[in-house]
């Protein structure tokens, strides 16, 4: 169903594999024809007389081209059987097959790699032994002293391919070929295992080889850079980009320097040994104490020493096994899309390759397993195998005691073929658990028969930052040095060879894990790959910056209390609690009588947005209390975008007459429960009304606020003035009455009776409940506690009468039409969907606030309900929360908003039907039938198709239409979402930039509009939500006057403009208090002269030669006429920019004619000082009280 674009595939794999879809149809057709083709046909002997019997009609007519079709071969039958047994759909199998075909390396790259390796082998044979005295290159490592007297020994072994190039699993688009060059044993001495001597010699050896290569004419034009492998400063590698047309800079060669395993004594680098002495860093160590183990440094050296043996075993396992190679390719795509393989602590693809061999040796994977079986088995075993206890690939069996001893020194333990090196030495526990969770999710997606899981597993890019709820960034160099100096344990310093990053990671992870406890699910390092640098420059200092992502536990993250041990029962525990929390800890007495140490972070009455900052409070306090790190030196990202649905600071709450405890910092999310409680009380009063002709059996709130999806703050400020209710917003309520057979059968009479019934309800409410009410064209307006409710009456007979049509023959038929669909959606389907979304918010507390961010973003991009329906936004966000896109549910609205942008950016709207199966109301067959109908009749569905399980026969066509949103608007929104994601990702992953300000995302660009119509600001009330500014003009004095309830004049006028002039212009405005209307003209062909036709005269004017033409000037006059009193003036964006550049107040308050006169340049008048002949100095310009605002006086 869904083909989402990816960013890692070479070739044509950027969208839906059309070939796969066609192949799938053909394969299914062949599978269905096998039974007929296998049956032998009876032969008629020549001597037999012709049969006179009437032959039976063959319902399955044979095509002309299939008369000589051969029966399926054994291989085809096996493939069909595998499809039925392994894949839950033929489509999934075809998609996998198509992707693997696209991933296969082209022959030109294979040839180039072979030729380059031969050339490099010949080059190494020409190298000569010698003393390395001087070099014009910089050694890619921070050396303790300048290199003197390093003797270069010619390599005795030919260079060889390692990694993906050796196993045949290279993955684009940037093809990286890893080559190993073994440093001979003679280059190393007996004591080189100590104090980074081996690493320094390795770096010098790499520098020498690089210098000789640059002198060689074979590599003279190539580009040479150094880089750190896996962000490890002890692992410099040479990155060479060949300059040749054959590979066109799409290929890169990385040169690794290794050493033979026999270079040092066996057991020298076991995890419990020490190979970095404290004296190396100038530290003192008591000789009586055992030296601390340096397991991570030892594993770093063993990576080089065991590389040859490990690669030989991998080559043996993967050679000529296309199934293993393709399976590993699938796993690499899955891993890279989740960005779990980046950096020092990354889960590399070489680990997956070794795990495939491990499963094969354990007889869990077989040599005949398909690529899909390989990937699925690896995911299943990853999810269900615990590596923290240790697993081993060693050819020689390892005793359980020794394996346990290995595992004690690492978070994760996977022993290699030699039995000496831990492949997962640098992987922290939280990241390993994350890999397991992602693997478990992949298996669950594969097992879901209702879902096309292919795009979710392989095609959808899921960067790690979009999977976390909060992010902690520390980038101040001096602060990090201070933390490492004062708080990093010497044992950790020696273990990581004084590399700062893993020390920081260990220090912060342990502290936050203890402080946050059950509030946090995972603490993940967010890394970016280090950038390469020219070989002539010094190696950069890395590791002085860290970024951690926190995945929160929604059930516990926002608790306001940390309760410690009882002071009387556990004195030591209470003392430890006070020491850990510092001054925040206090002795408190609780309602159950217990007296314990406790830390309070807020109150139960705090708003949800404030509670979401509790984790932030805890983290900053821990950093300050334990690490002396000031909050100004830390960037904690979590809740920055909540500002966009806060109450405008221009509106003063203290002037509002209400009994509700409202603060100036309140927001739309915190105000929603007040409205819901008022609605619940109104519902009880309606149910309790006496003497009604019919009983009220159902009351449903259908406005967005009843499902926590209203982005504009709703305050209790509605008023009754001269029998009119003034309110900034109304809340819609639908009621249904008990059954009665006395309702009229004529539509007008039925609606009149409905009106009379609503008046009766209003009178009863006034008499029995003392509520004010006003009857309007849309329903009964009721004023209660400062809120305005619009009560509508639903009746089944009205819907039937709207569908009723009488044919020419007098036959009554019932046919759906736009009016009946609208009524059915509003009165019968929306109440059910609204209830389901309300329940979803109760399950996932971040749902409502995510919708608020999404709606505010779309509104600030000048997309109103006429271009993009609000319900479409709510249902798309609900789709995010319903589907298993990530192992954990979204706990922070900011994360939900980022995933919403990803959904808009990467979805194939033309190929996907967004299904919301509330309460599992749909059966599996119903979903399959709907998807089949969607695929076969795609043209009958709108561009954005969303279906819920309550839509009945309107599924996919009820919440959106062909024009809302149109294909163009969908493309526009997709581009906007991609741009917003680029801004967010750049700010998140940058070391220097701070997180985006809301105005960077929630303010539209002023580019691309032809004209801007400005409204009179005193007639257009401002939104109560936080004003982030207009894209066209600067801020102005806000207008919070209350309009007549339900009178959204601007929306109605824009609707009229679209209905009349959408063929000639597109209209954009911000529905949340926008005071400008952006206009984009259609292409010039719409305004070209055309022959006179009676049916095509709309907005046309005669232009001679019996032709007519649409004139933009005439259209503008029509626009002014429709806008009437709201129109102020029309300007181009360029004119508005020019006014702002000239530091003039944008002309929003005055008449356009006067504005034009005042905008003309006037000669400057200079005053003279009294008593002197000198001219007085001109007054300084004041922007607020400029001459252009005198019209207001």
Swiss-Prot record:
Biological classification of the source: Eukaryota, Metazoa, Ecdysozoa, Arthropoda, Hexapoda
Family as reported in the entry's similarity comment: Belongs to the NRAP family.
Job description of the protein: Part of the small subunit (SSU) processome, first precursor of the small eukaryotic ribosomal subunit. During the assembly of the SSU processome in the nucleolus, many ribosome biogenesis factors, an RNA chaperone and ribosomal proteins associate with the nascent pre-rRNA and work in concert to generate RNA folding, modifications, rearrangements and cleavage as well as targeted degradation of pre-ribosomal RNA by the RNA exosome.
Keywords carried by this UniProt record: Chromosome, Nucleus, Phosphoprotein, RNA-binding
Ranges of compositional bias, category Basic residues: 1162-1184
InterPro entries per the UniProt record, alphabetical: NOL6/Upt22, Nrap_D1, Nrap_D2, Nrap_D3, Nrap_D4, Nrap_D5, Nrap_D6
Residues modified to Phosphoserine: 35
Protein name per Swiss-Prot or TrEMBL: Nucleolar protein 6
Skewed-composition ranges (Basic and acidic residues): 31-46, 1151-1161
Tissue: Expressed in nurse cells at stages 9-10 of oogenesis and exported to the oocyte.
Single GO MF descriptor: RNA binding
